[in-house]
A protein has these predicted regions:
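Beta-strand-enriched, solvent-exposed domains that form extended recognition/catalytic surfaces
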Residues: 1-23
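A metal-dependent hydrolase metal-coordination microenvironment
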Residues: 22-179
Length: 181
């Protein structure tokens, strides 16, 4: 409890972050790995987004435009050769066909979205995987889960970080992703 002059006593709570002694000398990095530019639904060019991240003191960022890996390479190219303490990772927000679930590919070495260009091969692989999904799921849930699993595996194959985007989005009057998934 504490009292400020002229006010009544009140209780305040706040989180306290503590680390082991061997971590005290390390500096945590600040960054954002889910950003969009004007190459999808953002407002600014990829290089501008990266510069804005640097300006506000971030140490790293990944541009993850919707279905667009090349925009992140454009951001990287704008800063190539500059001696700055700022890291730009490639990325994209992956939108699998017939699946409302979006996933970030941050730092991956290739575009996962582009792997779905052969739609027939993609659909066949997802159908095969869906058959192995838990029986308690609906056919749509099995396909969505198989699709998400495939995307996450491809991201890991490219040494990227995979993140489930917007898991609690509400579309219409229902969550975008069911609780079972």
């Amino acid at each position: 409890r504490f009292v400020l002059e002229g006010q009544t006593a009140r209780r305040e709570e706040f989180p306290l972050f503590a680390v082991r002694p061997d971590l005290i000398g390390l500096r945590p990095w600040k960054g954002d790995i889910h950003l969009h530019s004007s190459r999808s639904d953002g407002r600014e060019a990829p290089a501008y987004v990266a510069a804005a991240c640097r300006q506000i003191g971030l140490d790293f960022m990944a541009l993850t435009d919707h279905r667009n890996y090349r925009a992140s390479l454009e951001a990287q190219a704008a800063f190539q050769g500059l001696a700055i303490d700022f890291r730009i990772f490639p990325g994209e927000e992956v939108h699998p066909p017939d699946n409302p679930v979006h996933m970030v590919n941050a730092g991956g070495s290739f575009s996962v979205q582009d792997l779905m260009a052969d739609r027939a091969a993609y659909d066949a692989e997802i159908a095969r995987r869906a058959e192995a999904m838990p029986a308690g799921l609906t056919p749509d849930e099995r396909r969505m889960m198989a699709s998400c699993q495939w995307v996450f595996e491809q991201i890991r194959r490219g040494d990227g970080i995979s993140i489930l985007c917007h898991p609690y989005w509400i579309t219409g009057d229902a969550h975008n992703i069911t609780e079972d998934l």
